[in-house]
UniProtKB/Swiss-Prot annotation:
Residues 1-17 form the signal peptide. PANTHER family: LONG CHRONOLOGICAL LIFESPAN PROTEIN 2. Probable component of the endoplasmic reticulum-associated degradation (ERAD) pathway. This is Long chronological lifespan protein 2. Belongs to the LCL2 family. One of its GO terms (biological process) is ERAD pathway. The lineage of its organism: Eukaryota, Fungi, Dikarya, Ascomycota, Pezizomycotina. InterPro entries: LCL2. Keywords: Signal. It comes from Arthroderma otae (strain ATCC MYA-4605 / CBS 113480) (Microsporum canis).
């Protein structure tokens, strides 16, 4: 009888500890939302971005990644120019690729090799 009671107590304490762990890991529901609006992490919905995008004044093209107003889409700047190189394709489009520690111009060379199927 004592053994059964001790096993039951052990089971309950272990289960409670697990639930507390998961509650702490995943923010505990409402408590997480409150802390994010008080200067914590940014909420995971896209309302801020959509409101900013819809409220931006641009008579030409509004870049979706940076919200910069440019004449044509391939003139959009990279969101993180310190770590990204911009590569413009001949057909009026562009991409930003991670510099990845390569020497200057290496990213563009690798992109060209990939476009030709050589990489």
């Amino acid at each position: 009888m004592l053994r059964t009671a001790l096993l039951g107590l052990l089971f309950i304490t272990t289960a409670k500890a697990q639930f507390q762990f998961f509650e702490q890991m995943f923010g505990g529901g409402q408590q997480h939302q409150e802390s994010s609006s008080q200067g914590g992490n940014v909420p995971s919905d896209s309302a801020w971005y959509q409101n900013t995008y819809n409220g931006a004044q641009c008579s030409n093209y509004l870049c979706p990644g940076t919200l910069a107003c440019v004449a044509v889409p391939h003139h959009c700047p990279c969101a993180h120019p310190q770590v990204e190189d911009k590569f413009e394709f001949g057909e009026g489009s562009a991409i930003c690729a991670s510099k990845g520690g390569f020497k200057a111009g290496e990213t563009a060379r690798k992109i060209e090799l990939a476009r030709k199927g050589l990489l």
